[in-house]
């Protein structure tokens, strides 16, 4: 049951991380405002759902329309702000996207107020299916199916269309794409639209499970960055696998201690960065985009004894959360987790 719950929670995380990975792969901008698109998707889906009524068609129409509206907002952000700073230092780009976060926060507070919004139930998916002694919400099953559909749609989009070919080419060499006569500005804008739509869709479909509040952007962006790094920059399939991994860690880790999920998430990222700096499905040549700078080589584990030692250490670290409740008292456990966080 916890496994299926983890898959359901990974659905929206995958959509957000996929959009973030696509945007970074082409524009090379670490979009700190991507979590704001996720938050806007939830709030817009709430308002549109109120207007369209409580039918199944109205609910899913609100979800799709909210995602498209977030995509248009992403286009405005790209055209008015980010297009002017593509050649700026990374620190300036990060500060600019953080400014967008503050603007969206204030706009959301002004439009919807400070109160948390309770998400509506998805019509037709408001019951649960019994699996053994437990019950799994039908909406969780819908999220699992939706994430697979989104993954397939993205694969077809990037592998079977000319636009997808151009995007993959721009991910490898933007200058060569420009030399071939491709309008880079509008290619970047279209990529930003797709990435923002994915983030908005992730927020909209998560609304029935968690509602909407002003902390959604900050709560999702850290996990999304971890998923992108673990999966590999620019890899959609890697983002999917990493989202599933993080979702399962959260689902099982919460059984031990709720806050330990954050520790497990960054522990996995640290291990991946040490052994495979470019991510699970990333490529070494994508690990850096600075001319003349070589991608970092992974840690070389010489000999089978060293490899076995690292494996034992990794397994011990992963098993530590399950062993600590029996090894130390609750107060010491809470204190240790707070220190790690």
Predicted features and spans:
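Membrane-interfacial amphipathic/re-entrant helices at transmembrane-helix boundaries
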Residues: 1-15, 44, 55-62, 88-93, ...
């Amino acid at each position: 049951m916890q496994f299926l719950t983890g898959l359901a929670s990974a659905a929206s995380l995958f959509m957000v991380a996929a959009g973030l990975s696509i945007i970074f792969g082409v524009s090379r901008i670490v979009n700190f405002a991507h979590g704001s698109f996720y938050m806007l998707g939830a709030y817009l889906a709430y308002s549109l759902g109120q207007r369209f009524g409580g039918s199944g068609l109205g609910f899913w129409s609100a979800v799709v329309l909210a995602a498209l509206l977030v995509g248009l907002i992403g286009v405005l952000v790209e055209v008015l702000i980010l297009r002017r700073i593509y050649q700026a230092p990374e620190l300036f780009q990060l500060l600019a996207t953080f400014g967008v976060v503050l603007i969206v926060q204030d706009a959301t507070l002004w439009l919807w107020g400070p109160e948390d919004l309770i998400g509506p139930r998805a019509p037709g998916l408001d019951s649960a299916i019994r699996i053994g002694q437990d019950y799994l919400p039908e909406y969780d099953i819908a999220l699992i199916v939706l994430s697979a559909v989104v993954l397939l749609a993205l694969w077809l989009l990037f592998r079977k269309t000319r636009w997808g070919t151009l995007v993959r080419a721009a991910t490898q060499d933007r200058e060569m794409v420009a030399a071939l006569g491709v309008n880079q500005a509008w290619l970047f804008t279209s990529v930003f639209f797709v990435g923002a739509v994915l983030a908005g869709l992730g927020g909209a479909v998560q609304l029935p499970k968690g509602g909407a509040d002003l902390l959604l952007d900050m709560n999702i962006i850290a996990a999304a960055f971890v998923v992108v790094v673990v999966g590999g920059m620019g890899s959609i399939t890697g983002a999917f696998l990493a989202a599933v991994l993080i979702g399962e860690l959260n689902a099982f880790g919460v059984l031990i201690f709720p806050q330990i999920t954050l520790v497990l998430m960054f522990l996995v990222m640290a291990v991946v960065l040490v052994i495979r700096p470019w991510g699970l499905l990333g490529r070494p040549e994508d690990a850096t985009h600075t001319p003349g700078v070589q991608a970092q080589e992974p840690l070389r584990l010489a000999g089978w004894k060293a490899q076995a030692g690292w494996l034992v250490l990794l397994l011990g670290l992963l098993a530590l959360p399950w062993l600590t409740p029996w090894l130390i008292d609750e107060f010491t456990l809470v204190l240790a987790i707070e220190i790690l966080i």
